[in-house]
Amino acid sequence: MRRNCTLVTEFILLGLTSRRELQILLFTLFLAIYMVTVAGNLGMIVLIQANAWLHMPMYFFLSHLSFVDLCFSSNVTPKMLEIFLSEKKSISYPACLVQCYLFIALVHVEIYILAVMAFDRYMAICNPLLYGSRMSKSVCSFLITVPYVYGALTGLMETMWTYNLAFCGPNEINHFYCADPPLIKLACSDTYNKELSMFIVAGWNLSFSLFIICISYLYIFPAILKIRSTEGRQKAFSTCGSHLTAVTIFYATLFFMYLRPPSKESVEQGKMVAVFYTTVIPMLNLIIYSLRNKNVKEALIKELSMKIYFS
């Protein structure tokens, strides 16, 4: 149980480096990445909403992936940028818990949206004649609501485990945001239940969502090979290839981060990996899923042409 004598009211985030010249360089780099991520994902959401021919299940799910990536990056990057410039690198205890909650919730929302997108591709490629009726607006709304609700509840459960820990001593977190592994290393109460819960929840959700994706593709690949037209096969492989690329990158980093017990070495390595999936992946998803998509590019060109014409 959480002790009443908890003394820590704020934590110090050590960030990525203490070298001033590197901090300025990294600030510039991550600010540029964040601006591209925000502008790109917001633009993608608006583009899909504004163009009627993009009102299909695939783009509906893509718009939600863009929204989650935007939230994912915004939960971490602004504080990281502040740490690069500020002498006081602190975060309050409540703010730390909120950041932990949002991170855990958004990770689970994203992995299940990726699973839903795999199922959507299965329906489109393996059952094209029934796709329109079975992937109705109500079905799509249900499929996208489940990840949000489940992610919110899972994040709350895991954050409550952290809240029940007592932090009475050191308050320096060896990270650039409030991540569970380095945070629980600072607890002065028993962390066994929290570590066990973290391992089980991460292991189960990563494995189960990946299982859904793998099963979907076990049906998708044979169906693609049966497509007679070369253009049809190339289009199907291109769509699935983009999805598999994003899945591989995202899941590999998460498995590396969470399926190991916290230690000094794992925290240091995890910090480097976390840079990639909290700042770079939200930008990469935009490129992988959107800018390689013919319909999205055509819609973007049309919107830009109209703005130039009316300006």
Curated annotation (Swiss-Prot):
Record localization = Cell membrane
Q: What is this protein called?
A: Olfactory receptor 5M8
Q: Which domain of life is it from?
A: Eukaryota
What's a BP term from Gene Ontology annotated to this protein? G protein-coupled receptor signaling pathway
Q: Does the keyword Cell membrane apply?
A: yes
Q: Name one GO cellular component term.
A: plasma membrane
Q: Which residues lie on this side of the membrane: Extracellular?
A: 1-24, 75-98, 160-195, 258-270
Q: Which residues lie on this side of the membrane: Cytoplasmic?
A: 46-53, 120-138, 217-236, 292-311
The UniProt similarity line reads: Belongs to the G-protein coupled receptor 1 family.
Q: Name one Pfam family in it.
A: 7tm_4
Keywords in UniProt for this one?
Answer: Cell membrane, Disulfide bond, G-protein coupled receptor, Glycoprotein, Membrane, Olfaction, Receptor, Sensory transduction, Transducer, Transmembrane, Transmembrane helix
Keyword Lipid metabolism in the entry? The reply is no
Transmembrane intervals: 25-45, 54-74, 99-119, 139-159, 196-216, 237-257, 271-291
GO terms assigned for molecular function: G protein-coupled receptor activity; odorant binding; olfactory receptor activity
Q: What residues bear carbohydrate chains?
A: 4
Which Cys pairs are S-S linked?
96-188
InterPro entries documented for this protein = GPCR_Rhodpsn, GPCR_Rhodpsn_7TM, Olfact_rcpt
The way this protein sits in the membrane is described as: Multi-pass membrane protein
Query: What organism is this sequence from?
Result: Homo sapiens (Human)
Function as written in the Swiss-Prot or TrEMBL entry: Odorant receptor.
Q: Which gene encodes it?
A: OR5M8
